[in-house]
């Protein structure tokens, strides 16, 4: 694939990053165990109990560019923040396309996002950093997250959501680090042609849903098919998402039945599937409960002051 091509299908690098950290970082393994224990404890007591109302998360967008086109505009950045605020508050108009049988599952994530107004030193900022790099493209090896390797250093992850926007190779649209990983690499990386709704954003990933998907991972959501190939044995640890054989690509039609999940089939319109941007438009109540538990247990300092 040429460096500047937009992938034809969604590819997410979060699980390879997760598996690498499980192999190499015992601190991450312990943190993941604590995170999942907190999730199951919250289910046992009937739901998360920490935060009430809406959490506002400060965001810093690190634009790491090699060509002028990759140095995306402020307008493109703002368009992505707008998408996130609609998607995580269930105010996106296309949520009305949810099939009637799944409509009762749709939930408000109770999270909103704003570009940071102060930097780590307390100085005023527009929440966007720009770094010219000699690297033609990046991968899921986290080099984009460090000045020393051609990227941009993160702001403190206990206060900010770090979003890196760059050229990704290998067909990647983006990747995230689940809660519990190293602070130096915490955050989300998105291909610039899959970021926002204008500028370099290109179909079929020009509705800003790649960032919605990856921030879902950053908030501890899994892919809805459970990442087990096509075995129908995987689990996303959320009870109200139907079991699915594997990822759905493109623009599926309802119902798409797999894993004996008829008559209604897969929840392919969920943000944590692999459908095109215009075919995903909802989180479920169970996913929101998991997100809120992750804020309580994994990210207790973010969005609270």
Go through each PLM region and give its residues.
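Fold-level signature of zinc-dependent metallopeptidase catalytic domains
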Residues: 38-85
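Soluble non-cytosolic domains of exported or imported proteins
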Residues: 71-79, 202-206, 210, 266, ...
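Metzincin-family zinc-dependent endopeptidase catalytic domain
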Residues: 78-250, 255
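N-terminal zymogen propeptides
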Residues: 1-54, 88-89
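Soluble periplasmic/extracytoplasmic beta-strand elements of cell-envelope proteins
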Residues: 58-62, 162-164, 189, 271
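Short, histidine-centered active-site or binding-site loop motifs used for metal coordination
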Residues: 61-65, 194, 276
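Short glycine/proline-enriched loop/turn "hinge" motifs that connect secondary-structure elements
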Residues: 49-54, 180-183, 263-264
